[in-house]
Amino acid sequence: MEYANENCNGHASQDICVKGHDQQLDPLNWNMAADALKGSHLDEVKRMVKEFRKPVVRLGGETLTVAQVAAIASQSGTDVTVQLSEASRAGVKASSDWVLQGMINGTDSYGVTTGFGATSHRRTKEGAALQKELIRFLNAGIFGNGTESSHTLPHSATRAAMLVRINTLLQGYSGIRFEILEAITKLLNNNITPCLPLRGTITASGDLVPLSYIAGLLTGRPNSKATGPNGELLDAVKAFQRAGIDTGFFELQPKEGLALVNGTAVGSGLASMVLFDANILAVLSEVLSAIFAEVMQGKPEFTDYLTHKLKHHPGQIEAAAIMEHILDGSSYVKEAKIVHEMDPLQKPKQDRYALRTSPQWLGPQIEVIRAATKMIEREINSVNDNPLIDVSRNKALHGGNFQGTPIGVSMDNTRLALASIGKLMFAQFSELVNDYYNNGLPSNLTGGRNPSLDYGFKGAEIAMASYCSELQFLANPVTNHVQSAEQHNQDVNSLGLISSRKTAEAVDILKLMSSTYLVALCQAIDLRHLEENLKATVKNSVSLVAKKVLTIGEKGELHHSRFCEKDMLKVVDREYIFAYADDACSATYPLMQKLRQVLVDRALLNVDGEKDSSTSIFQKIKAFEEELKVVLPKEIERARSDLEQGKPAIPNRIQECRSYPLYKFVREELKANYLTGEKVQSPGEEFDKVFTAMNEGKLVDPLLNCLKEWNGAPLPLC
């Protein structure tokens, strides 16, 4: 854009006064909004992660991102620092000077010479006293001292709010001194965090009540508190000392109190934190769905590009392409194809919906989360107080940018998307632990030798049901519960912070579900490894016993029963190993029953041979079973022991898969162990390791490593 110099003498850095032709290019900002969604969601998440890890956040008013807000919120000043654009100083000073000059000239201006809200008909010439009273009466929050539950806003959310508020005020439309913004920056960089109440805002004339506590600290109110870098409680004097603010407490000038409190920073700051996590969780859900397809021996056809191209939705197409990339060349997929070809009737022609329609299910959720992210990024770069000081036109504009509807709406939508992701995750988890549906894995993913004394993930499934139920409840909207407030002046209000808080809860619950599910998938991977080793052992044992017992007759001649071996090995191939592995030679379990049936069927065809004991196959059945009972249990135990000692005969297929980085991270870095009733560890201990790592951001790199080779496009149709 080109800036028109003749009318923009107060805001030379702003794009308000533009030549008519340029203004007509995108006067409604729709092109800007559309451009922000170009490129893949995964590339955007990668950019967010990169921004999150930068050591400096430079504020100029218009380029703040949700990742930068999340970085400042979650890290101390020693990890990442805030720098203010010096170029913003002139515009900030111009608006501040304009307010003071207006007082001198006797200009009547809302919140400067008038009362507030429904009482704006009142007038005063005591501008500084009015700001002081504004902060006092807005300090109406309750911190709940003496109760078990905290009523204090999490310090990370407060840090996010401080950053966003600085960014708004830097744009020079609010009538506040630059020195106040520098003081808030010093608080951030020295990890001094004001204590704000958790509740009490409707985010409609902004987040008045919580923001007033930041103003209270800046003005040295006796009730104001802050926490230091180590969580120690500080009064205002000590907070200023620790932050290195040596100018003393601020005596607010006209409009400055209103500038500090009349904005949406608390709701949009928390929303930024939520969306940073939500975007990563969306990618995680795609990868976990692909791993689910691997361990369930799913048919990869569900990811075919043509299917999704014909549906047109970009989120669905990308979700399918990511899953397709994970499954392309997967050793599990190759093995599953062999299994399906060997016995096409062993499982349904089509996989169940939780697997087969996962791209269609996740795609819209990704689109919603991405759109919400862009909406919040516009909000955190907006000027959202009232009135706005337009120095260039010498006027104060009385409007309603403090209305936080973009926050409430985007957070309600995000929460619904998170609930849908959680519902899919629970459906997949339920299939995974159910031996009626999981294609040969043990019930409850039991990892021990004795399923009667090992109930695996049964407790985890109950917990997952609990998490999912709460998550579905949280999906209910907040924004349809508006109450008229402040003498019916604030008769519609956004409830933005309330919705952000509920969405933060939803993110937390989805992390609980994701942690549990990831450990379950790792368990399933190890069980497939055990299954493969045990099946090879059983086949080898059956083959050895068959050769020993069935090949030679009583007189050393070749026996007709030798032809049974091939059919017996087919039985082993087709029978689920965990259906009998705990007592392989039990007559009540399917292996022995079906091996015997092979011999019986062959004997029935051996009519003449059965008349002679030396050629009778029936006569061989008992000898075969007795010999197998001697050999097989020992060999199964040996195979288990070898695997437990890290010496399996067959390596783990996961090492040949693109999903391996996540598995390796869980097993090797976090030391989250294979679960079995034979060990002391409880499932929750292992889930906690993953949950903690997820909250610390440690899961991001292994997650993205699973997709590092993806070129951003589906496989070509050929």
From Swiss-Prot:
GO terms for molecular function: phenylalanine ammonia-lyase activity. The active site is at residue 110. Competitive inhibition by cinnamic acid (CA). SUPFAM superfamilies: L-aspartase-like (SSF48557). Induction: Circadian-regulation with peak levels occurring at the end of the light period in flowers. Triggered by EOBI in flowers via the regulation of its promoter. It is found in: Cytoplasm. The modification 2,3-didehydroalanine (Ser) is found at residue 205. Its main location: cytoplasm. InterPro entries: Aromatic_Lyase, Fumarase/histidase_N, L-Aspartase-like, Phe/His_NH3-lyase_AS, Phe_NH3-lyase, Phe_NH3-lyase_shielding_dom_sf. It catalyses: L-phenylalanine = (E)-cinnamate + NH4(+). Contains an active site 4-methylidene-imidazol-5-one (MIO), which is formed autocatalytically by cyclization and dehydration of residues Ala-Ser-Gly. CDD domains: PAL-HAL. GO terms for cellular component: cytoplasm. Its EC number is 4.3.1.24. Keywords: Cytoplasm, Lyase, Phenylalanine catabolism, Phenylpropanoid metabolism. Pathway: Phenylpropanoid metabolism; trans-cinnamate biosynthesis; trans-cinnamate from L-phenylalanine: step 1/1. This is Phenylalanine ammonia-lyase 1. It comes from Petunia hybrida.
